[in-house]
């Protein structure tokens, strides 16, 4: 149990630092759409899709790696709470179209990236 807790802790810290770096780099590029948050969510969705596909095929993987990557890293990297706050800020500023676009791109983009990663991994390992 302690190993699993440490894996979540290490993965979460690493994912959070990655999210912060992406936000610092990409959020200033567009004043209405926080591109760093979007990038973090899309990358996280892709990684978790790839992880779930990999773990479903490689059943001998230590559970520590599973929680480090999915619960830890992807949990720290993806930013639903930040995303939600940013949408609320856009709404408060009266930028309803941008808020709706932000919701649309983050949610559908994340679903698409998860499905793409799962499909790519499954296709590459099919015999």
From Swiss-Prot:
Na(+) binds at residues 75, 78. It catalyses: fluoride(in) = fluoride(out). Na(+) is not transported, but it plays an essential structural role and its presence is essential for fluoride channel function. It is found in: Cell inner membrane. It is a multi-pass membrane protein. Fluoride-specific ion channel. Important for reducing fluoride concentration in the cell, thus reducing its toxicity. Belongs to the fluoride channel Fluc/FEX (TC 1.A.43) family. This is Fluoride-specific ion channel FluC. It comes from Shigella boydii serotype 18 (strain CDC 3083-94 / BS512). The gene is fluC.
């Amino acid at each position: 149990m302690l190993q699993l807790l440490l894996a979540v802790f290490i993965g979460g810290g690493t994912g959070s630092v990655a999210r912060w770096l992406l936000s610092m780099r990409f959020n200033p590029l567009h004043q209405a759409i926080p591109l760093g948050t979007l990038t973090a969510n899309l990358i996280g969705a892709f990684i978790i899709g790839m992880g779930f596909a990999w773990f479903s095929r490689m059943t001998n993987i230590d559970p520590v790696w599973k929680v480090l990557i999915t619960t830890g890293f992807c949990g720290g990297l993806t930013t639903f709470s930040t995303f939600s706050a940013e949408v609320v800020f856009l709404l408060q500023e009266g930028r309803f179209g941008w808020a709706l676009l932000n919701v649309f791109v983050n949610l559908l983009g994340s679903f698409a990236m998860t499905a793409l990663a799962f499909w790519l991994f499954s296709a590459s390992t099919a015999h």
